[in-house]
């Protein structure tokens, strides 16, 4: 009998893919987003060799030499439009965040029972479910995310912990949530006439 040939094992090298820290796309695709300038700056600071490959003078001139004059002009106009749109959207988002209030409401349920309701966290980039779980652990109470009658998600924490919640939010999420945007409200339940 003949010898059976053993299959040769090849060591495959894993490719390291670089993703942009601004738009989360590979750097080759950053030009198609609206944040091309910011992406270029990020790439220059963090991955110099990839930056040289994509944005060096010779790389840019070789790419431009294949385009006609009218296509170059159109590409420049499109890039300017995208940049302006991205800047406008970013400004609008920052303005919306600055104006958005986080409301911490103390609501009376029964005679001496209270719940604390927190709304408006999602505007500042916080996940309601995650924050609700952290609040439940921190204050050792029940905490859940519910939809209000208006259709907005709110966090309901059992007990009168509104001032403690305010302090905790500033301590943990102080960077995302400025103190001027937190509002304490006391809401008493109306007595039903029977």
From Swiss-Prot:
Entries under InterPro entries matching the protein: DENR/SUI1_TIF, DENR_C, DENR_N, SUI1, SUI1_dom_sf
- Principal location class: cytoplasm
- One GO CC annotation: cytoplasm
Alphabetical list of PROSITE patterns matching this protein: SUI1 (PS50296)
What is one GO biological process annotated to this record?
formation of translation preinitiation complex
Q: Which UniProt keywords apply?
A: Cytoplasm, Ribonucleoprotein, Ribosomal protein
Q: Which residues cross the membrane?
A: none
One Pfam family of this chain: DENR_N
Q: Where in the cell is it found?
A: Cytoplasm
Instruction: Specify the SUI1 domain's residue ranges.
Output: 102-173
Q: What terms describe the molecular function in GO for this protein? A: mRNA binding; translation initiation factor activity
The keyword Lipoprotein is assigned to this record: no
Q: Which residues form the signal peptide?
A: none
Record family assignment:
Belongs to the DENR family.
UniProt note: domains: The SUI1 domain may be involved in RNA binding.
Q: How does it assemble?
A: Interacts with the 40S ribosomal subunit.
This chain belongs to which protein, by name? Translation machinery-associated protein 22
């Amino acid at each position: 009998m003949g010898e059976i040939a053993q299959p040769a094992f090849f060591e495959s090298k894993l490719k390291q893919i670089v993703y942009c820290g601004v738009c989360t796309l590979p750097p080759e695709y950053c030009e198609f987003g609206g944040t091309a300038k910011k992406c270029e700056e990020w790439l220059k600071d963090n991955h110099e060799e990839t930056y040289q490959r994509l944005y060096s003078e010779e790389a840019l001139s070789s790419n431009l030499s294949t385009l006609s004059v009218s296509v170059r002009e159109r590409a420049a106009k499109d890039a300017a439009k995208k940049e302006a749109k991205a800047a406008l959207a970013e400004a609008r988002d920052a303005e919306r965040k600055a104006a958005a209030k986080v409301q911490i409401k103390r609501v009376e349920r029964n005679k001496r029972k209270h719940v604390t309701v927190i709304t408006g966290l999602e505007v500042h980039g916080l996940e309601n479910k995650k924050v609700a779980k952290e609040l439940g652990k921190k204050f050792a109470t029940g905490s859940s995310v519910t939809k209000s009658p208006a259709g907005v998600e709110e966090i309901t924490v059992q007990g009168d912990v509104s001032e403690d919640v305010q302090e905790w939010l500033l301590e943990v999420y102080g960077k995302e949530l400025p103190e001027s945007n937190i509002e304490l409200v006391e809401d008493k339940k109306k007595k039903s006439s029977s």
